Every structure is written in structure tokens, then in C-alpha cells.
């Protein structure tokens, strides 16, 4: 929110790609551990900057679709990552890390020439008078504004609650597929990853198109679209938890992915209805941090449930939290505009 977002995007991509390259030289766990920590910081710099930049370039009729198209990159990356072990088996894991890192660093250089900051933002960053400079929002002033807005607290919970099953599927779905379908992990990993990635890809595109059209007729269209996505994840989590046949489990995975994709495409557009452009990066950064913390907690919790043989029940119980978030969202989120200034 305070510096040029183009250079945050380019810099973070270069750093995490460089870290990926260096991982190929790691000799022990501690080296991987600290390199992964640096990667986490650089990745955290990226997502608020990128989504804020996209939201500024795409307003009204194309915002949700643009965010959705961007999110497809994450899902494609996850799907490709599902074959990381296969690639490593062919070329060695050292070479795999090296080349993924090299590709990322080259692409960051390409972005220097192709990525542009929004012109309106650049004008705002160059006030014509000393008085204009004084109006630049302070860090703590922005945080104070966000946390004093009740709608932001609702959005924060609305974002964090689905992050629990979202991270649960990323980290534990292969194990659940392996146990429920009685198949080896070597098969369960790619099946679960591709199932979620493909269906989420479909979900973000559908959710983006539906939201952009609905909001033209009803200002709560984005809220309703996000609610549809969350609603789809509830039966999906129940089926994932208690399903035992191939059709039930795979079908549940597809349903969850579509629902989560619809939800994912509308987070930033909904935020734009309640938070001004000056604070959107900060707001999404806080949301992303909260979601990751929730994911870390549920990953550890599901690990304990797995040891106790209750992984399926754990997935099903997560649907309760999603239902609470869904109810709060529909009752409290009543935007007055599609683009808060």
C-alpha cells in the first residue's frame, strides 16, 4: 500500500525463485528449513501486492474474473507440483530445484519489462504539494482503520474459516484418499492433487464470470457468489470424511474444488467493496496471514487425528466452521458500492 507494487511482485518472485535454486544445494534439514522460511517471507510479499494491483487494473465488470484467472496459476502450479517427485526421480531432486528456480528468475526479469503499475496509483504516489505528502496514510493509521471496521472482522473470519479445510486438503487429502480408497500413496498423491487443482481451476473461472455479471444487477452479487462457493464445500467435506467408494471420494474432491475456487475468486473483490484502495494490500496481507495461521493449526490438529484413526471425521467436522462463516457472511456483509474509494 505504500510502495510500488510492480517491484514488490518482481522482487518477491526473484527471491523465492532464487531460494528454490539454492535448495538444490542443501545438504541437511536445517539448510532446507531456513531457506523455506525465506521463501515464505518472499511469497507473503507477493499475494497482497499482486491482487491489489489486479484489483486496481480491473474494476466492475472484470474484477472477479481477473482475480480468478490469476488464481488459476496457483492451481496449475499445485497440479504440476504433484508430479514433483516423478520429475525428481527422473532428473534428481537437485536438478529439479535448480531448473524451477532458474525459470522463475528468468521470468522475474521478463516482468520488469511487461508488468506495469496502475497509472492512478503512480499519480497518487507523487503528490504535488507538501500537504499532499502529509496525507499519506501511516502504517498504524491503516491498521487502526481496518480493525475499527466491523465488516473487516467478518471478512477476516469469512476468509479464515474456509482456509481450515483449504489447507487440510492441500496437506492431508493424499493421506485421506490413500486410507479411504485403500490405494498406495504414490497413486493417492497425484489423484488428489489433480482432482482439487482441476476442479478449482473450473471454480475460479465460473465464480469470476458469475460474480462480475451478478454484481451489475445486485450489489450483493459478489457476496452471494462467494456464499454459493462456500455452500458447495459443506457437503463435499462430509463426503470426504465419510465416503468410502471411489466415486464418492473423487466426486467430493471435485465438488470441494469447484466450491473453493468460486470462493477464492471473490475474496479480493468482496474486500474491495468494504476497504478503500489505499488499504487493500494491508487488508489482504492480514487475511492471508490469518488464513495461513489457521492452516498451520489445522494441519497439526489433523495430524493428531490421523494418528488416532479419525482423519475422515476431522474433515467432516470442518464443515461446521464453514457453515458458521457462511451464516455470518450472508447476514452481515451488505456492501453499498462495488469499489470503495
Give names to the regions the model predicted.
Residues 1-27:
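Conserved MFS/SLC helix-loop-helix module at the cytosolic interface between two early adjacent transmembrane helices
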Residues 4, 25-31, 59, 243-244:
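Helix-breaking motifs and short loop linkers at transmembrane-helix boundaries and internal kinks
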Residues 9, 32, 220-226:
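Primarily marks hydrophobic transmembrane alpha-helices of the MFS/SLC 12-helix fold
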Residues 35-73:
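Cytoplasmic helix-loop-helix junction between adjacent transmembrane helices
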Residues 70, 74-119:
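Helix-loop-helix hairpin linking two adjacent transmembrane segments in secondary transporters
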Residues 118-154, 180:
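Juxtamembrane intracellular "pre-TM" segments in multi-pass secondary transporters
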Residues 144-205, 264, 268, 299:
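Extracytoplasmic gate region of multi-pass secondary transporters
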Residues 272-309:
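A late C-terminal transmembrane helix in Major Facilitator Superfamily
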